[in-house]
Amino acid sequence: MQIQENISLKTYNTFGIDAKARWFAEFANVEQLNELLSLSIQHLSSNIQHFILGGGSNILFTSDINSLVLKNEVFGIEKIREDEDHVYIKTGAGENWHRFVLHCIENNWAGVENLSLIPGNVGASPMQNIGAYGVELKSVFQELEAFHLQEKTNYVFGLKDCEFDYRQSVFKERYTNQFVIMNVTFRLNKKPVFNTSYGAVEQELEKMGVKELSIAAISQAVINIRSSKLPDPAVIGNAGSFFKNPIVPRGIFEDLQKNHPGIIGFDNNEGNIKLAAAWLIEQCGWKGYRKGDAGCHANQALVLVNYGNASGAEIFELSEQILQSVKAKFGVVLEREVNIVSREA
């Protein structure tokens, strides 16, 4: 275990941005993390900043990072208990999310099949309350263990402690860079409750010729849909959906409908309407746009891409232009789903 200097992060982020970390190290457990923190203070700087890196699938580096980047390599999937209806699976934060989902399906543990093929690691899943096709992480979340970087103490966070919301949790803003998520425990169902409420999933299942519904079939349907709409980061650098779908009061949505009859919105069951950000962006003419190696994907306007050698700053500037144009045309303020990481991370 050692601390390296001036390491390229190009292969550690799905955008493929060639930012450099001033210092870089990996840890596989709390003991190694503690040792690295002590070493960094003793030998590098007493006020050194630390940045925790997971799968690198939801970040955009806009510059080199003048911090110690600590790569989370905590692995392991363990069934810790079960009852008549549920199994409780404790999973290392460094585990790949999609591989974890496939492991659950192989064991007939239900609840995460709709979240298939979401990029990133398990540790990031509660940070942003990942969700897709009618399911959010919070519906299968039991608890997580996290290590406080300053106090050097372990904490357990339950469902209420995490304050989950749409693509949001306490770790994304309030506790940014204060805690390291070490593992997450999921409560999965022994008796599946299928969720095919999204039309695209039902259509894909029909296209697949599925006669008997199963979690494996739903997972494959989701994989097919995502593969057809979203570019593979191994081929074209991207972080999936760059923007959140904005939520507006019903009255605002009705006003928007008068001026923009084709606007797409979905009831979020809380009296508000979730707008389709991709539609807003497409109406502003950004779908398929490219300047240099930074662009907006031709098949999915929510996805910003690096066609090769774009800098993080160039992609960020493109996102700024998109935000401004959507606000000017619709009066709607988009939020980035991707975390922006600058020099002093």
Regions found by a protein language model. Give the residues of each.
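Residue-level preference for nonpolar/small residues embedded in alpha-helices
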Residues: 32, 96, 273, 318-319
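A generic alpha-helix structural signal
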Residues: 33-40, 101, 202, 219-222, ...
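Anion-binding (especially nucleotide phosphate/pyrophosphate-binding) glycine-rich loop
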Residues: 1-151
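Beta-rich strand-turn-strand
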Residues: 109, 312-318
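Phosphate/pyrophosphate- and phosphate-bearing ligand-binding catalytic cores of soluble enzymes
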Residues: 3-5, 10-17, 59, 154-304, ...
